[in-house]
């Protein structure tokens, strides 16, 4: 009886607990801002004397429309911040759940992998060692990596090092798949060399309790040790020497030399081109008994994957690479849980898998758990976030962010939670399985692996020799395999948007799966953020383009909320992101009102002597104070707040605006969206985040079209405030009713302050100066605006 009672108590221990975060004061502040916005709208709509004062024209109506849009966006933000919560995880209780895992349970993923979660699990990779997004596939978590072309492939090869903590059972279900979309022999060579280095690196980490498993970070600083640590010092010196040798070998590697002298191991790369090559699948490390590291082994399989590419087939960028990796991992190890991380990220917390498992398995309706997302964090980042790309304040939701995410494979396969319950008994004959047979098409091995995932019973699945499944893996990674199937539509990562990660997460939510956010201390994964103006704005343009594509497509969240299982508040949360491009257009219209009124001697804001001026001033002060305190609460500095505030204006008038017009032109058939890779320039040695720039915190420019609208806006405001000041000083506006007041001048000055990097860029030199081609095109836009303004 006592034993039964103890067993029940052990099983009832919580794996996670949801702790609501009380934000009463914040809610009140939200309503204050909303009230002021509505008051401004009411005042503008009921201003009977507007025509008499000369302010009832187009500027007044445009201002009303823009301010109504701002109120709508504020409502979306209020929804996203309405009921925040954190999840406290208890990984120490996983052992108790493991003991119960041998009995039948409702969970579809508990029986196949929890043995693996008894010990710490760290998935570490050196950014230069793998070429892309990293996929882990184990009987618990799977890890998958989809590789970057060229620059982010070979350069990422040295720093992605596979790790390890010990695994007691089912070692063969732990695997790492690295995708190289560039099909580079140098990337493959780097992975092979990194795996060899891991034979000494992993035991060193175990012996000395090293928590930072990424060697480029660990060796960036000298360790602290005492007189009794002679053995550790010797080991550290030896490992540092071995790592330096590894770095030199990889950096000195040449593709031509490898192909000429590498022998049969590189034969498949001989005629391969980046955009035209056959599928290449190579097992770099097979975790069988003879390859085990140490007495208990635990080092994962390491598989290199370069999916087939052909000029006649659309390869769907990252989504296509992730789908190929999903199929390859399914026919080789078929883990029920998968972790994917980008090529520039490494694991920073060895306990991250345990915490993620607590969230995947810890809910009462755990069968509905779809994914756990770890918010992105960055290493070696510039002080005070000068380019506003860390998203520490706005990115706190439950969206799938494309990296650092633990997925249940069943959710990726496009089925709904209810279908698993229905098909639990006799899964091979259940409707859900028959449907999946149609979706997965020709590969019997892939359909058989899917049967185990859908049934939720992994105990009967044999553990295969992965080397014997290479040909099958090549078959499912061929470019013709997806023809006639539902891959990219209902199965796998979704196609149809440049932000395939957000679209995939939305589809998972619309099917009825739940998600959770995982935040650990230290941060679970660290990556590098783009630096400089071109990289930052290119990234935001790509995001906004993809998000706007979703908004105007059949994947609109409003439709999914009506016809599928997407909750209404989830729908509003997705809309918060999808309207980025529309915000760019609306905010530009509002920003153009200021120079327009200064140039045409009009007014669209209240005069200081009017009662409505208090509403406008209160709204400006309240909103900025709210935003400022929000940054302070996140532990950021005043400078970080200002940098993000000014970058919001710059991004809106450049990246978001171009995304808006890009998608519109694509919609009417005049253009096609082009996937642009974000360049992330980082140090190749010490990982301290510094590059070759004299001042990496300064804004840099190039001839990209993304700089044209902001440059034009900067020039226009300089011209407008100059003309407006001239008129005010020399009294040319005395007899003009409704002329610009202090509000227009202050708004113009505030906007120029936000655009200060572009003001400096107009007179800067080198990469710190705006190219003459951009200045010329911007000048033409300014001239056109002045011409149109004078005609009115």
Curated annotation (Swiss-Prot):
Location within or outside the cell: Golgi apparatus membrane
The EC number(s) this enzyme carries: 2.4.1.-
GO biological process per UniProt: cell wall organization; cellulose biosynthetic process; plant-type primary cell wall biogenesis
Region called Disordered, residue ranges: 132-154
One of the record's GO cellular component terms: plasma membrane
Active site per UniProt: 181, 501
Family membership noted in the UniProt record: Belongs to the glycosyltransferase 2 family. Plant cellulose synthase-like H subfamily.
Protein name: Putative cellulose synthase-like protein H3
């Amino acid at each position: 009886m006592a034993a039964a009672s103890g067993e029940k108590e052990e099983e009832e221990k919580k794996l996670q607990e949801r702790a609501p975060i009380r934000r009463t004061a914040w809610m009140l502040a939200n309503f204050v801002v909303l009230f002021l916005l509505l008051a401004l709208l009411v005042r503008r709509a009921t201003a009977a004397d507007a025509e008499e004062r000369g302010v009832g024209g187009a500027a007044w109506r445009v201002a009303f429309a823009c301010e109504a849009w701002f109120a709508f966006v504020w409502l979306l933000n209020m929804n996203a911040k309405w009921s925040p919560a954190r999840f406290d995880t208890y990984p120490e209780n996983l052992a108790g759940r493991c003991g119960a895992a041998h009995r039948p349970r409702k969970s579809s993923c508990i029986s196949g992998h929890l043995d693996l979660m008894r010990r710490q699990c760290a998935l570490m990779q050196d950014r230069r060692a793998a070429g892309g997004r990293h996929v882990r596939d184990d009987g618990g978590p799977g890890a998958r990596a989809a590789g970057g072309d060229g620059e982010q492939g070979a350069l990422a090869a040295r720093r992605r090092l596979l790790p390890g903590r010990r695994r007691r059972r089912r070692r063969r279900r732990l695997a790492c798949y690295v995708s190289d979309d560039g099909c580079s022999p140098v990337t493959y060579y780097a992975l092979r060399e990194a795996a060899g280095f891991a034979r000494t690196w992993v035991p060193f980490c175990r012996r000395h309790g090293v928590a930072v498993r990424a060697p480029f970070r660990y060796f960036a600083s000298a360790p602290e040790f005492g007189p009794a640590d002679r053995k550790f010092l010797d080991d550290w010196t030896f490992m540092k020497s071995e790592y330096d040798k590894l770095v030199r070998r990889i950096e000195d590697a040449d593709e031509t030399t490898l192909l000429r002298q590498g022998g049969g191991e590189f034969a498949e790369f001989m005629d391969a081109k980046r955009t035209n090559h056959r599928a290449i699948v190579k097992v770099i490390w097979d975790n069988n008994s003879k390859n085990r590291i140490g007495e208990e082994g635990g080092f994962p399989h390491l598989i290199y994957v370069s999916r087939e590419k052909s000029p006649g087939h659309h390869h769907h960028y990252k989504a296509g690479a992730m789908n190929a990796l999903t199929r390859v991992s399914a026919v080789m190890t078929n883990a029920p849980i998968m972790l994917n991380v980008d090529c520039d990220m490494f694991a920073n917390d060895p306990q991250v898998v345990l915490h993620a498992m607590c969230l995947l398995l810890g809910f009462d309706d755990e069968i509905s758990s779809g994914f756990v997302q770890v918010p992105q964090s960055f290493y070696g980042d510039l002080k005070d976030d000068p380019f506003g790309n860390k998203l520490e304040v706005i990115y706190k939701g439950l969206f799938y962010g494309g990296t650092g995410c633990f997925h249940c494979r069943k959710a990726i396969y496009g089925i709904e939670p209810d279908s698993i319950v229905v098909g639990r008994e006799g899964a091979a004959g259940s409707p859900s399985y028959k449907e999946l047979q149609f979706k997965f098409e020709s590969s019997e091995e892939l359909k058989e692996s899917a049967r185990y995932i859908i049934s939720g019973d992994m105990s009967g699945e044999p553990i295969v020799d992965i080397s014997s499944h290479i040909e099958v893996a090549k078959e499912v990674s061929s470019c013709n395999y997806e023809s006639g199937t539902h891959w990219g539509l209902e199965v796998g990562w979704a196609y149809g948007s440049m932000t395939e990660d957000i679209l995939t997460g939305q589809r998972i939510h619309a099917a009825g799966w739940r998600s959770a956010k995982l935040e650990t201390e230290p941060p679970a994964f660290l990556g590098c953020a783009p630096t400089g103006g071109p990289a930052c704005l290119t990234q935001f343009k790509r995001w906004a383009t993809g998000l706007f594509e979703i908004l105007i497509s059949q994947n609109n969240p409003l439709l999914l909320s009506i016809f599928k299982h997407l909750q209404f508040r989830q729908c509003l949360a997705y809309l918060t992101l999808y309207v980025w491009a529309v915000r760019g257009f609306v905010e530009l219209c509002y920003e153009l009102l200021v120079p327009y009124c200064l140039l045409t001697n009009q007014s669209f804001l209240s005069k200081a002597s009017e009662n409505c001026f208090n509403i406008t001033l209160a709204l400006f002060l309240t909103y900025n104070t709210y935003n400022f305190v929000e940054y302070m609460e996140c532990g950021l500095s005043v400078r970080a707040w200002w940098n993000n505030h000014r970058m919001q204006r710059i991004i809106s008038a450049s990246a978001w605006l171009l995304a808006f017009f890009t998608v519109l032109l694509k919609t009417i058939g005049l253009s096609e969206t082009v996937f642009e890779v974000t360049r992330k320039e980082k140090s190749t040695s010490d990982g301290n985040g510094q590059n070759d720039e004299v001042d990496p915190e300064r804004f840099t420019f190039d001839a990209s079209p993304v700089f044209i609208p902001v440059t034009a806006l900067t020039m226009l405001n300089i011209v407008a405030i100059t003309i407006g000041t001239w008129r005010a000083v020399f009294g040319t506006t005395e007899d003009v009713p409704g002329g610009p007041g202090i509000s227009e001048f202050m708004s113009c000055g505030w906007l120029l302050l936000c655009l200060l990097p572009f003001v400096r860029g107009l007179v800067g030199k080198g990469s710190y100066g705006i190219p003459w081609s951009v200045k010329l095109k911007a000048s033409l836009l300014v001239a056109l605006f002045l011409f149109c303004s004078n005609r009115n």
